[in-house]
């Protein structure tokens, strides 16, 4: 069943200039956990892209492996390729789990010559990240939904225009077999404390808190200059590149490196408010944050 949310999802691809034929001629890596957000991503991509999809699932040993089995059978049902990663030892922190996922995703991206990594981060995740950065006294820059890893390979987060409530509605409408991971309710993780304790408290103080702040974050994320491909960025006048980079908060040396050294691609690490420049000829040596 085709819904208006499919149109919004497809508009994200058009905004990011990902609707060209060459974008769909390579495989797409989909990070699928089995939760409602990731299954929405899988359903959208399966309906709109139709082929060249690779489902990637990570098992951090936080709970039983039944979620991996469910994602595996769902991939088989949709006739999609499947990749499975399981840690040798249990991972104890969110930061280690994040680094483990992205390290393997980026390595798999280069090994398979895939076009992009797609993750199922929503506006609700962006709000939690914003609060986490604010509480941790880091500059709250939010999440970039498109990051170029090399000249043609990207990290794409197409669900940032949706909230968790909207993805829940989508799973109900399409009868998607979502998996509720027990680790999402463990208060030992800071993100779960924000999700289940702080945000409900703030919404109780101000019922419009979630809507207002999410709208402000979305307005910043949807800046069209953020999603321009590298060749479009390099074609902009130098004075305009300088003005945009200054608004992003880059230092003078970073601006000079961005404008005058075209062999580097820009990767933004939103958790530490720094910019790293990655040599396209190498594989990967940089951090990416949720």
Curated annotation (Swiss-Prot):
Protein name: tRNA(Ile)-lysidine synthase, chloroplastic
The reaction(s) this protein catalyses: cytidine(34) in tRNA(Ile2) + L-lysine + ATP = lysidine(34) in tRNA(Ile2) + AMP + diphosphate + H(+)
UniProt cross-references to HAMAP family, sorted A to Z: tRNA_Ile_lys_synt
Top-rank lineage group of the source organism: Eukaryota
Binding site for ATP: 33-38
Comment field on protein domains: The N-terminal region contains the highly conserved SGGXDS motif, predicted to be a P-loop motif involved in ATP binding.
GO terms for biological process, alphabetical: tRNA modification
Species assigned in the record: Cyanidioschyzon merolae (strain NIES-3377 / 10D)
